Amino acid sequence: MSYLETTDPEIAAIIDKETNRQINGLELIASENVVSRAVLEASGSIMTNKYAEGYPGKRYYGGCEFHDMAENLARDRVCSLFGAEHANVQPHSGSQANMAVYFTVLKPSDKILSMNLSQGGHLSHGSPVNFSGIIYESHQYGVDLKTERMDYGTIAEMARTIKPKIIVCGASAYPREIDFKAFAEISEEVGAYCVADIAHIAGLCATGIHPSPVGLTTFTTSTTHKTLRGPRGGFILCDKEFAAPIDKAVFPGMQGGPLMHIIAAKAVCFKEASTKEFKKYSEQVVKNARTMAETLSANGVRLVSGGTDNHLCLLDLTNFGITGLEAEQALGNAGITVNKNTIPNETKSPFVTSGLRVGTPAVTSRGMKESEMKQIGEWIAAIIRDSKNTRLQETIREEVKSLASQYPLYPDLT
């Protein structure tokens, strides 16, 4: 028996159940991935025992010499990966990375211009229920409701009228390439700071599959646990002129002690992301997403914007007479994990929605390619068309389990 099974059998049993769920199912949530065993090992390492408030060379506690080495390595690796001048790897999440940037250059009631949450944005980009929409005056752009793509001309007009202090570019449910150069030019024209939140596409930006904002925007924020395939956490990239204020905004402005076991795991993830193998992985993520999009479209499922350029597809379920919530539950019964999602022209609550978001990072990490995406797309379409058919869900669940067994989550983990 493991130490955990002996000490806390209840939690051990829950973890075993979650392990089996992941092993036997298909994770298609676009913000999820499967970390390497090396990242898992670092995340659960003895580094968790140490308090390390401050930064390398300027800690408030003794005994941090090896934590300094780990954090410096993480900072150096992510700067090298993205070609950045400065990195802060201490934010516990992407939202906290965004918060630190706001705290650096904004005062309460300053104006933010960012993407509307219901059309693909993120809570921390100025949603009225989030700190970013409570502390600051939030203005939001959306997509062109015909093309369902960003209209940079309209965004520029809004920026000229609103004159925001910050323009945020980035999304959590936008399947198309983002023109960071256009955002940088708009920001420069109106005298705004430009913040690129690449949480979803960081792995694609790091490998050149998607254009990177680094060197164009004032700040770049991200998570490490989506397409970067690292531990749960965030980071900030900026030029050296903002290094000191950004670091001060993170600590002591926003956080106390950093999670050093997670920072060690971030360092591992940045090393992995610099390899040729990771670039091939990132290329396959996009190939898989496009194949799934084509399969779904061929089966009568309308895709928001008509397809995808990245790791995710956004499905419009309106013509099938079911909600995103109903589809999420039906697919979940079949062992396919997705999430309900709002779509442009949304008429339903965000807890119900008219759409689904599906992504390929996790299944690609398991080794699946185009042929598997075609099969998965067929399963999704079949369940969407007949969402009340529990016998169909049970049949597909067995087929999903069979497919998943061919691509072990971790070959040495049972």
From Swiss-Prot:
The keyword Cytoplasm applies. The record marks 225 as: Plays an important role in substrate specificity. Its cofactor is pyridoxal 5'-phosphate. Pathway: One-carbon metabolism; tetrahydrofolate interconversion; Amino-acid biosynthesis; glycine biosynthesis; glycine from L-serine: step 1/1. Keywords: Amino-acid biosynthesis, Cytoplasm, One-carbon metabolism, Pyridoxal phosphate, Transferase. The keyword Cytoplasm applies. GO terms for biological process: glycine biosynthetic process from serine; tetrahydrofolate interconversion. It is an enzyme of class 2 (transferase). Signal peptide: none annotated. Its EC number is 2.1.2.1. One of its GO terms (cellular component) is cytosol. Catalyzes the reversible interconversion of serine and glycine with tetrahydrofolate (THF) serving as the one-carbon carrier. Also exhibits THF-independent aldolase activity toward beta-hydroxyamino acids, producing glycine and aldehydes, via a retro-aldol mechanism. Belongs to the SHMT family. Homodimer. This is Serine hydroxymethyltransferase. It comes from Methanospirillum hungatei JF-1 (strain ATCC 27890 / DSM 864 / NBRC 100397 / JF-1). The gene is glyA.
